[in-house]
Regions:
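N-terminal secretory signal peptides
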Residues: 1-31
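Compact alpha-helical subdomains of small soluble proteins
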Residues: 23-96
Length: 96
């Protein structure tokens, strides 16, 4: 499995966004409010779902997203959004 684009843990999934996004993109996300972040669910969330294989092919990451979120029925799309929102929250705290 290509670990670069297919992280197996939730921490790897969030950390990978900090590694692959350029400084300008990080600043754009950091400058968004929680309400504005919702506009990125359909775009960035979809890319995360595809590249992290959350729609199928990466059951370990999906399982961990369910466990950490406390939502056992989380699907691939919801898991991608959860990863995106956690990434955004870390940006807000300056923990990138």
């Amino acid at each position: 499995m290509d670990r670069q684009w297919h992280p197996e843990t939730f921490a790897e999934a969030v950390d990978l966004l900090f590694q692959v996004l350029d400084e300008e993109t990080l600043e754009i996300f950091a400058g968004r409010t929680a309400e504005e972040l919702k506009f990125y669910h359909a775009t960035a969330g979809e890319l995360i779902k595809i590249h992290y294989r959350l729609a199928g092919g990466n059951p370990s990451l999906l399982h961990e997203c369910r466990k950490i979120s406390g939502k056992p029925d989380l699907d691939g799309e919801q898991a991608a959004i959860y990863i995106l929102e956690t990434f955004w929250a870390r940006l807000q705290m300056g923990k990138g």
